[in-house]
UniProtKB/Swiss-Prot annotation:
UniProt source species: Schizosaccharomyces pombe (strain 972 / ATCC 24843) (Fission yeast)
Keyword set includes Nucleotide-binding: yes
Protein name: Ubiquitin-conjugating enzyme E2 16
Phylogenetic classification of the source organism: Eukaryota, Fungi, Dikarya, Ascomycota, Taphrinomycotina
Record family assignment: Belongs to the ubiquitin-conjugating enzyme family.
Gene, per the UniProt record: ubc16
UniProt pathway: Protein modification; protein ubiquitination
């Protein structure tokens, strides 16, 4: 068993042993492929994402944990640092600031934190960033609440 797979088995066991606020599910998609994972996250309280649940599609590469995973929102979401078209997440820790000290669990927690702390200067969703840059936080929050209701409030299919 290679070191990436050993590490992923340990991470899965660690997630199963704990109760992580905001991270409802983190597991391999199948028992035979440890390099493709799903996660379900909850929107942070006191944000326009509150009450929503999003499915993340996580692809782990052979060089893990030296190389970062690729993470995509499978559920539609409005956020300046998340692509509306393909769900790609723009975060330094998933690119140039990745460290082997990070885990899939800590990456998911960082994504939950990103929902509260956007960076409108480096957007993947230009329309969302424009609302924030022009100071129209009310319109941004309304758009987020609306799309959260439309896409992230339904029952998530059984992924367990």
């Amino acid at each position: 068993m290679n070191s990436s797979i050993k590490r992923l088995h340990k991470e899965y066991a660690s997630f199963q042993a704990g109760d992580i606020s905001g991270l409802l599910l983190l597991k391999p998609v199948t028992d035979v492929d440890m390099f493709h994972w799903k996660a379900v996250i909850e929107g942070p309280t006191e944000t326009p994402y509150e009450g929503g649940q999003w499915v993340l599609d996580i692809h782990v590469h052979e060089g893990y944990p030296i190389s970062p995973p690729s993470v995509y929102f499978q559920t539609k979401i409005v956020h300046p640092n998340i692509s509306w078209t393909n769900g790609e997440v723009c975060m330094d820790i998933l690119k140039t600031h990745w460290s082997p000290a990070w885990s899939l669990q800590s990456a998911c927690l960082a994504i939950i934190s990103l929902l509260s702390n956007y960076d409108a200067s480096s957007p993947l969703n230009v329309d969302a960033a424009k609302l924030l840059r022009t100071g129209d936080k009310t319109a941004y929050n309304s758009l987020v609440r609306c799309t959260t209701y439309l896409y992230a409030k339904g029952k998530i299919e059984d992924l367990s």
